[in-house]
C-alpha cells in the first residue's frame, strides 16, 4: 500500500468512504466492520467513523458531554463498556446532526484508539495520535508529523 502524508490532506477536511477492515477491541471485539468513513484533514492522521450498528450490543452509552467542530458540527460522546463491566470514559463520539458536507456521518461512531485496548486497520495495530483531543488512527502508511502533541495545537 502507498504511504500518505498528513500534510497532503485537505483543509477543510475530506470525507471518504472506506471498505477497509476496521476492528476495535475492548473486553473482546467491540466493533468489526468494513462499513466506515474516514475523515482526512491537514496535519491529522485519519479519523475513522464506524457503522454504529456494527458495535457490540450495549457497548455505547451516551454521556452529557459535547464539543463543536467547525466542519462537522456538534459532537456527542459515549462511554464504552466492556462485557466485564470495565468502562472507557468518553471513548467514542458521533455527530447526530452533522453539517451538510458531513451528512453521511450520521449513524457512524468514531473511537479513540488510546482509550480502548487495541484498534486495527486491515490487520495492522494502530498507534494513537498524541494528546487527548483528537482520535486519529496511525498506521505504517501514515507519515507525519501529526497534530495533537504538545506545541502543535496551533498548527
What do these predicted ranges mean?
Residues 1-155:
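Terminal leader/tail segments of proteins
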